[in-house]
Amino acid sequence: RDRLRSRGLGDVYKRQIAMAGYTAANNIFGFLYVTVNAVTQACMSFTSQNYGVGKWKRMDRVLIDCLILSFVAMMILGNSAYFFGPKLLTIYTSNSKVIQCGMEILLYTTVTYFLCGFMDLFPGALRGMGRSGVPMILSIIGTVGTRIVWIFWIFPNHRSLDILFISYPASWIITIVLQVICYYFVRKQLYAKMRAEA
């Protein structure tokens, strides 16, 4: 009985450490999101402006430039966040175990955050073309759907923070594939329509 009780308390302590580590890491993670979102909003704005005046070749250039900008920004900021992670995490906690846990989370989220930027840019471009419904559904399926499947079917067999947070880049990759396919067909349809009207 005492053994079970101490084991239960140990599990609670581990969960508290994991939650504190995630909370601290998520604060750093938020700064990266602001950068990615700024590039996505720029992509959407410039795409919609060019779409409005029928400059469809410029829309491709906008997306390519934004993909490059997002990639470069996230490689610099994401890797810097991980490199300076131990120091940055001390802003939020002094517990060494929480910092270690936060670093595990940062490894799978900040270093690969350029994937999240790519995932957001294709829907941003599609919204600029007046198509928002399908990209929204694909984003929900790709991110939320993948993580739900991951938590219920993969995580129970390999219960560790590493396996749990690999679901982030995995869901981003799946969503990117879905969004690129959607972008290809929408672009093809819109460009055919624009050529017919020209």
Q: What do the PLM-derived regions correspond to, one by one?
A:
Residues 1-13:
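Single conserved hydrophobic/aromatic residue that forms the stacking wall/gate
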Residues 6-7, 44, 128, 150, ...:
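Tryptophan-centric aromatic hotspots in well-structured domains and transmembrane helices
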Residues 11-30, 97-103, 131, 166:
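Interfacial/gating helices of multi-pass transporter permease domains
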Residues 21-79, 83-85, 116-138:
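Small-residue-rich hydrophobic transmembrane alpha-helices
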Residues 26-29, 73, 141-146, 171-175:
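Transmembrane alpha-helical core residues of multi-pass small-molecule transporters
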Residues 47-112, 154-198:
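Short alpha-helical transmembrane segments in multi-pass integral membrane proteins
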Residues 109, 139-140:
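Short, contiguous acidic/charged loop-to-helix segments that flank catalytic cores in large enzymes
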Residues 145-155:
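Transmembrane alpha-helical segments of integral membrane proteins
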